[in-house]
A protein has these predicted regions:
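Sec-dependent N-terminal signal peptides
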Residues: 1-16
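Surface-exposed, beta-sheet-biased, low-hydrophobicity segments with strongly acidic/polar composition
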Residues: 15-158
Length: 158
């Protein structure tokens, strides 16, 4: 079975600073797109969408697992995809959620199977975020997609 595991760790070098220089401050990335409630939208790897006038932001942090059977391989199990989303809702603590499941060969999530521990939607405050698609579908066993190639389709409901 083919796996592409998300490392999720980055390092940055910070120049040496004297005692009077404050440490760098991490600020959230500005939204790279806007989305409406109840309307599907796409989110590329590393991008952030502002939903409902910015009351909810969703950032596609990475691929936790993509064990979907590549198109050029015969597998006993079709595998699944799990993605990590950083979600911030107004008045709520920010959280990272993992959504996923089994998809068809076009990356569209199929109805969830009870024996799998993955979920395709999550409640955050007054919102429900649902994963609809995860593409690209792996085509070749020896050439898994890079994280930068992934795009998700999501919908947010209140």
């Amino acid at each position: 079975v083919w796996f592409a595991m998300f490392a999720g760790l980055t390092t940055a070098s910070v120049p040496a600073a004297g005692p009077s220089t404050p440490p760098p401050v991490s600020t959230p990335a500005p939204p790279t797109g806007e989305a409406a409630l109840d309307e599907p939208f796409t989110l590329a790897y590393g991008s952030t969408a502002a939903v409902d006038g910015g009351n909810l932001t969703i950032t596609f942090e990475g691929i936790v697992e993509d064990s979907r059977c590549p198109s050029d391989v015969m597998c006993a199990w079709s595998g699944q995809v799990i993605v990590a989303l950083h979600i911030e809702a107004a008045g709520e603590d920010a959280q990272t959620v993992e959504l996923g499941g089994i998809t068809d060969s076009e990356g569209v999530l199929r109805p969830q199977r009870p024996e799998l521990s993955t979920v395709s939607s999550a409640a955050v405050g007054e919102y429900t975020v649902e994963l609809l698609t995860a593409t690209p579908y792996p085509a070749h066993a020896n050439e898994p997609p890079s994280e930068a190639e992934y795009t998700l389709s999501l919908v947010v409901r209140r």
